Regions:
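Sequence/structural signature of beta-propeller domains
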Residues: 30-368
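Secretory targeting and sorting signals
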Residues: 2-33
Length: 368
């Protein structure tokens, strides 16, 4: 069954990403934490729609998860095209380029992805070739796959390889953590409402805490997962009746933090501003008052909220140069730049604007 997203979940008031900035509903005073006074500039770098961004790439449709490998180009999961594409440039608005490599993702509909710096997570080609995956992917079809440049030869390969297929799973997020028992993959299965853990042999592992939150409202499920600073951050959204897509709305989101073995450490007390949250990143140095804060991007209304990463206390909302909250239609990933794609003081974002029928890669930086 194709579990690819089929409907819009955004409020009608969300701005189209082609405009980059927009105004959504006003959040009551005190709900988002202290105002910072800093404002941020949004740049559109790549889109599938001509004229929207610096460059046009027809593969970039419903741009979702992202990852880097050291100083590599940025890898982006193109959910509606069943591929991953690579980008470099765009540093502080500089020249943006498209890498010619396009990687096919088995099962299609890719969502989360991670780079793998370890020698674990070996993938195998039908020709007998094998190597550790350099990048790993999950998708709404329940496929966990990996790409290695030599599998199959000749390099660079244009095909990721299946590692685990879970019938009925609708995987929305993927993270990699380094534990005392070796590297582990964390997969957010939105349909089952679980965070599934796999070791370096792609074997399922039951953790001590098993990522349980007994105070989570009924019908909320893991929407994304990220390992940041040695902790596992999990965002939750409300499931629709089919347990495939999220239900958007003010307060329709939760945020928890766990240990690497799945023990609940804390919950975000202020979740009224969360609206189907998916994007997770620690803001880099040079990102103004939010430097070092946990950034949480709402898919539901396109806003980006900041939290103290230690206490999960809200610290504010990212605002544009007009002083109003930045609103990015169909916002998915948040990722600090690495100097190859985006500056090291910038935050990259992906989005699936206009009901996920288009794609956008852009950047956020402190206003000049």
């Amino acid at each position: 069954m194709d579990t690819r997203r089929t409907r819009s979940t955004r409020w009608a008031g969300a701005a189209v990403a082609a405009g980059a900035l927009g105004v959504a509903l006003v959040i009551p005073a005190g709900q988002v934490g202290a105002a910072t006074g800093d404002t941020y500039q949004v740049r559109n770098l790549v889109s599938d729609v001509p004229g929207v961004a610096q460059v046009t790439d027809p593969h970039l449709v419903n741009a979702w998860g992202v990852s880097f490998s050291g100083a590599s180009p940025l890898w982006v999961s193109d959910n509606e095209k069943d591929v991953a594409t690579l980008y470099a440039g765009g540093v502080h608005g500089g020249t943006q380029t498209i890498n010619p490599l396009v990687v096919n993702i088995p099962g299609g509909a890719p969502t989360g992805q991670v780079s793998n710096p370890t020698t674990s997570f070996v993938v195998h080609g039908s020709d007998g070739s094998s190597a550790p995956a350099r990048f790993l992917f999950v998708g709404e079809s329940g496929h966990l796959s990996g790409w290695a440049p030599t599998v199959p030869p000749p390099p660079p390969s244009t095909q990721a390889q299946d590692a685990v297929v879970t019938p009925g799973a609708v995987d929305k997020g993927l993270a990699l953590g380094m534990t005392d028992n070796g590297p582990m993959l964390y997969v957010a299965d939105f349909s089952a409402g679980t965070v599934d853990v796999y070791n370096g042999l792609f074997q399922r592992v039951i953790t001590a805490g098993n990522f349980q939150d007994r105070k989570l409202p009924d019908g909320f499920a893991p929407f994304n997962v990220a390992v940041l600073g040695g902790k596992v951050y999990v965002t939750y959204a409300k499931q629709d009746a089919d347990r495939v897509d999220e239900v958007a709305g003010a307060g329709m989101g939760r945020l928890d933090v766990f240990s690497l073995d799945g023990r609940l450490l804390d919950r975000a007390a202020g979740h009224g501003q969360l609206n189907a949250p998916w994007g997770l990143a620690i803001a880099p140095a040079g990102f103004g008052a939010f430097s070092g804060d946990l950034l949480v991007g709402n898919f539901g209304d396109g806003r980006i909220h900041a939290f103290d990463p230690s206490t999960l206390v809200p610290t504010g909302v990212v605002s544009g140069e007009d002083g109003r909250p930045v609103t990015i239609d169909g916002l998915w990933a948040l990722q600090p730049g690495n100097g190859t794609e985006g500056g090291t003081d910038e935050v990259l974002f992906t989005a699936g604007p206009q009901d996920e029928s288009h794609g956008l890669l852009g950047s956020l930086s402190l206003s000049d």
